[in-house]
């Protein structure tokens, strides 16, 4: 882990970020840098560099699947949309991404999650339809 120079780790993360977000990558990172949440841009750079772009265990596509699986139960459609598209940008097929989404939805629903009422009350679930590709 520590054999790779920090500059290479950060570049690897930058390259993976660009792969996932494609033509909107600069805009999204700029928004994170300016959003008012201290160090969000730095945190993203470090997470992508040290964790998400490391392909020693998972491929980029498999990493995208893990991210999709983590985002669906959190009800964060804007982030989920980016990672659904990012999985395709990284080499997954639309059918594969839909299959991963479907399995995760089945697991969430089996765990008691559901579409919430319009006022957002009523337990664990989603405030709107879960994003898809």
Where are these regions (language model features)?
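Acidic, glycine/proline-rich low-complexity segments that act as flexible tails and inter-domain linkers
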Residues: 1-60, 94, 109-133
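A short, ordered amphipathic alpha-helix with a cationic face
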Residues: 37-38, 71-75
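Short, structured motif recognition centered on aromatic/hydrophobic residues
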Residues: 62-72, 104
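Short helix-coil transition sites and intra-membrane helix breaks within transmembrane domains
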Residues: 73-78, 113
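Extended intrinsically disordered, low-complexity coil regions enriched in Ser, Thr, Gly, Ala
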Residues: 76-106
């Amino acid at each position: 882990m520590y054999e790779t120079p920090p500059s290479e780790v950060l570049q690897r993360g930058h390259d993976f970020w660009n792969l996932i977000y494609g033509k909107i990558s600069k805009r999204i990172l700029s928004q994170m840098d300016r959003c008012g949440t201290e160090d969000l841009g730095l945190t993203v750079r470090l997470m992508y560099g040290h964790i998400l772009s490391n392909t020693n265990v998972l491929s980029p596509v498999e990493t995208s699947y893990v991210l999709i699986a983590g985002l669906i139960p959190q009800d964060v459609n804007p982030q989920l949309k980016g990672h659904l598209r990012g999985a395709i940008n990284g080499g997954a097929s639309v059918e594969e991404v839909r299959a991963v989404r479907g399995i995760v939805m089945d697991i969430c629903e089996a765990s008691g999650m559901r579409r919430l009422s319009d006022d957002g009350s009523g337990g664990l679930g989603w405030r709107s339809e879960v994003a898809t590709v």
